[in-house]
Amino acid sequence: MALPSSSLSSRIPTGPHPLTHTQCIPHFSTTINAGISAAKPRSFYLRWGKDSQPKNLGSNKIIACVGEGTTSLPYQSAEKTDSLSAPTLVKREFPPGFWKDHVIDSLTSSHKVSAAEEKRIETLISDIKNIFRSMGYGETNPSAYDTAWVARIPAVDGSEQPEFPETLEWILQNQLKDGSWGEGFYFLAYDRILATLACMITLTLWRTGETQIRKGIEFFKTQAGKIEDEADSHRPSGFEIVFPAMLKEAKVLGLDLPYELSFIKQIIEKREAKLERLPTNILYALPTTLLYSLEGLQEIVDWQKIIKLQSKDGSFLTSPASTAAVFMRTGNKKCLEFLNFVLKKFGNHVPCHYPLDLFERLWAVDTVERLGIDRHFKEEIKDALDYVYSHWDERGIGWARENPVPDIDDTAMGLRILRLHGYNVSSDVLKTFRDENGEFFCFLGQTQRGVTDMLNVNRCSHVAFPGETIMQEAKLCTERYLRNALEDVGAFDKWALKKNIRGEVEYALKYPWHRSMPRLEARSYIEHYGPNDVWLGKTMYMMPYISNEKYLELAKLDFNHVQSLHQKELRDLRRWWKSSGFSDLKFTRERVTEIYFSAASFIFEPEFATCRYVYTKMSIFTVILDDLYDAHGTLDNLNLFSEGVKRWDLSLVDRMPQDMKICFTVLYNTVNEIAVEGRKRQGRDVLGYIRNVLEILLAAHTKEAEWSATRYVPSFDEYIENASVSISLGTVVLISALFTGEILTDDVLSKIGRGSRFLQLMDLTGRLVNDTKTYQAERGQGEVASAVQCYMKDHPEISEEEALKHVYTVMENALDELNREFVNNREVPDSCRRLVFETARIMQWFYMEGDGFTVSHEMEIKEHVKNCLFQPVA
């Protein structure tokens, strides 16, 4: 793709989309300044090397270090210099390309996808489709704790039997070998002790299971002390409320437990302190998370008042335990209906909360998207999101559709995913979770928050639209929290026990939304994703439709399959580069691998192979043309080259130097080939369209060449106006768009064309991020125009640091606007919208820390290229 070394651009005009040839080309003067020979070179550049650093000798001189000697050149800060003698051209050299054939051969995997693997991919896709299609109220595992509370309920007919005898039997049959109750594959002392205590009390109340009780007591005595070694962040929700209350009950029942353990005393003290701070009027005023733990508040609850806060489904915040406690106190029929509803689903046990329908759908969609396999499930994803959106609330959502207490975790996840899929959702929903100090918390009016929910808020904050200050506040707040969490091992995590949440946080902070690419995120998340992750509610629970081995298996097979296709395409493109004679061009950069990587990082799907070829070839041309017009060609020769493109006349190459002859001939032949294929795809001739796109680019390069020749520093606005073309990104995108699998009408092309705000923002953000990382080096090479320098010219009173800050502000605001264009431009096919938006993102990624295009081999970028293109996932 086009990643020019010279700087150009800032504010882009927003006029209507021109369609005709004469309308499309901006009016760029090709008249050479009177005092300058058009046949002489226009600029000087430093040789590449550690000793070739520019030395500033004041406002009027720059010395270029070239070999053993130096070249002193006048530096003019005036707008134009009419009598400037042409400076001597010093050959510019780039660092050599890292990706030589032997390097690529040593990295390329010999693995080929077998027929059995292809069959397995098909099977997994079918299985996962069935997972999505079977989503109802949520799939989850049994909660021994909640089942014990439901088993307590006496028969409503007055007999001395449990209302749900099957739950009592489940407790008797599901004690673990160590005497505890809970999930056997994962030991969390908090969870096991809580569930074991609840089951022992229930068995004691029904005077059954003496053997199980005895084993449970033994477990409690030997293992309870381990709680002191566990992080506070692993303490289940409401533990300090329900555990002391049950201990008190156990003591009354005569269970022989170590009530004097220090941690037990500490938990009791925490409960008392919390209840002292609890205004009773709040308990009944509106739904809060206290409804989730009413079984631990029985001595203070006014049961008639609390009934007013019952959910529509009859539950109390979807908790079977809390609902069972209310039923035993009130006999409320809706409570009983809810419990019957849950048992009808699960048979002889209940989960820790139910339903989980919104949570399940959102996280399943997020999982397949982050793993890079979402393209296989477009219909299923739409159905899931339609369901979530139908239950969206401007106050936020919780984990279930009728949950009266919204949480920031589900709300932020929903806001981000729904917005990116084109649903109309407002960021104002986050205001529900912001306190008077500007801090964000998981639940309204509480101070609880964890790493996972703050991570989701942070991810959400990056899809902001212009003017959404709440998103900016959320970004700053969560970045601060997450960076502190990385320094505090105990901060991981209040709501989930994940395989590598730390790795997820590190990736999100280093590669936020505008600096991450789909293929890179997939590679990273494949490593971080845990198919056996568990969540923490009142007890530990699992979500098999979110954490599932099948997702991971498909992601790995699919990644490696696509990677093998990419390796073949890259070999083809490298052969094309060599056969074209480009290796003989010493004035330009050989970056075939980096350019192909930029395309494969986002348009990676097998069906877009032709688009990747075109994107890569056109990007290579724009780099060559940029280097040609930027420093190598004389103005006479450049005008001849531009005339050749305008006339589309191969005979003009006879008047060109050899290097230009190579460039023009290969451009001519390649564009003709692309046009033939484009005609097949679009059903109409596209050669004129492609030539027009190229003419516009060369006109912009010509203007830039004139600026360089005359040492002219344009105003910020003038600089930006030309940058909408000279950045070259639009050239690549507008031609590649013809191969995205859609028939593009003139109307659609206008919505991504030169006059569209969408394309302008892509160009603007790409140019500005380039300038922020290259302007100093290019200034040392004699370049006089960049966003920073032009803004300083307009505002001579400001410092360079202030100018740079302004450029960053313009860019960040433009990225927010780009979000809005990407999301709302629904008349443009998805593949075309992606092409524009992801091209903007790859620029942010390449220039995140420096000039990652020119010197990628010296940066972390090299490892990402390896991971994306060469190293299969295990």
UniProtKB/Swiss-Prot annotation:
<keyword id="KW-0934">Plastid</keyword>
<dbReference type="InterPro" id="IPR008930">
    <property type="entry name" value="Terpenoid_cyclase/PrenylTrfase"/>
</dbReference>
<dbReference type="Pfam" id="PF01397">
    <property type="entry name" value="Terpene_synth"/>
</dbReference>
<dbReference type="Pfam" id="PF03936">
    <property type="entry name" value="Terpene_synth_C"/>
</dbReference>
<feature type="binding site">
    <location>
        <position position="630"/>
    </location>
    <ligand>
        <name>Mg(2+) 2</name>
    </ligand>
</feature>
<dbReference type="GO" id="GO:0010597">
    <property type="term" value="P:green leaf volatile biosynthetic process"/>
</dbReference>
<dbReference type="InterPro" id="IPR005630">
    <property type="entry name" value="Terpene_synthase_metal-bd"/>
</dbReference>
<feature type="binding site">
    <location>
        <position position="626"/>
    </location>
    <ligand>
        <name>Mg(2+) 1</name>
    </ligand>
</feature>
<dbReference type="GO" id="GO:0016102">
    <property type="term" value="P:diterpenoid biosynthetic process"/>
</dbReference>
<feature type="compositionally biased region" description="Polar residues">
    <location>
        <begin position="1"/>
        <end position="12"/>
    </location>
</feature>
<dbReference type="GO" id="GO:0000287">
    <property type="term" value="F:magnesium ion binding"/>
</dbReference>
<feature type="region of interest" description="Disordered">
    <location>
        <begin position="1"/>
        <end position="20"/>
    </location>
</feature>
<feature type="binding site">
    <location>
        <position position="778"/>
    </location>
    <ligand>
        <name>Mg(2+) 3</name>
    </ligand>
</feature>
<feature type="transit peptide" description="Chloroplast">
    <location>
        <begin position="1"/>
        <end position="37"/>
    </location>
</feature>
<keyword id="KW-0150">Chloroplast</keyword>
<keyword id="KW-0809">Transit peptide</keyword>
<dbReference type="GO" id="GO:0016829">
    <property type="term" value="F:lyase activity"/>
</dbReference>
<comment type="function">
    <text>Terpene synthase (TPS) involved in the biosynthesis of diterpene natural products included in conifer oleoresin secretions and volatile emissions; these compounds contribute to biotic and abiotic stress defense against herbivores and pathogens. Catalyzes the conversion of (+)-copalyl diphosphate ((+)-CPP) to isopimaradiene.</text>
</comment>
<dbReference type="InterPro" id="IPR036965">
    <property type="entry name" value="Terpene_synth_N_sf"/>
</dbReference>
<dbReference type="InterPro" id="IPR001906">
    <property type="entry name" value="Terpene_synth_N"/>
</dbReference>
<feature type="binding site">
    <location>
        <position position="626"/>
    </location>
    <ligand>
        <name>Mg(2+) 2</name>
    </ligand>
</feature>
<feature type="short sequence motif" description="DDXXD motif">
    <location>
        <begin position="626"/>
        <end position="630"/>
    </location>
</feature>
<feature type="short sequence motif" description="DXDD motif">
    <location>
        <begin position="407"/>
        <end position="410"/>
    </location>
</feature>
<keyword id="KW-0460">Magnesium</keyword>
<feature type="binding site">
    <location>
        <position position="770"/>
    </location>
    <ligand>
        <name>Mg(2+) 3</name>
    </ligand>
</feature>
<dbReference type="GO" id="GO:0009507">
    <property type="term" value="C:chloroplast"/>
</dbReference>
<dbReference type="InterPro" id="IPR034741">
    <property type="entry name" value="Terpene_cyclase-like_1_C"/>
</dbReference>
<feature type="binding site">
    <location>
        <position position="409"/>
    </location>
    <ligand>
        <name>Mg(2+) 4</name>
    </ligand>
</feature>
<comment type="similarity">
    <text>Belongs to the terpene synthase family. Tpsd subfamily.</text>
</comment>
<feature type="binding site">
    <location>
        <position position="407"/>
    </location>
    <ligand>
        <name>Mg(2+) 4</name>
    </ligand>
</feature>
<feature type="binding site">
    <location>
        <position position="630"/>
    </location>
    <ligand>
        <name>Mg(2+) 1</name>
    </ligand>
</feature>
<dbReference type="InterPro" id="IPR050148">
    <property type="entry name" value="Terpene_synthase-like"/>
</dbReference>
<dbReference type="InterPro" id="IPR044814">
    <property type="entry name" value="Terpene_cyclase_plant_C1"/>
</dbReference>
<keyword id="KW-0456">Lyase</keyword>
<dbReference type="InterPro" id="IPR008949">
    <property type="entry name" value="Isoprenoid_synthase_dom_sf"/>
</dbReference>
<dbReference type="GO" id="GO:0010333">
    <property type="term" value="F:terpene synthase activity"/>
</dbReference>
<protein>
    <recommendedName>
        <fullName>Isopimaradiene synthase, chloroplastic</fullName>
        <ecNumber>4.2.3.-</ecNumber>
    </recommendedName>
</protein>
<comment type="pathway">
    <text>Terpene metabolism; oleoresin biosynthesis.</text>
</comment>
<keyword id="KW-0479">Metal-binding</keyword>
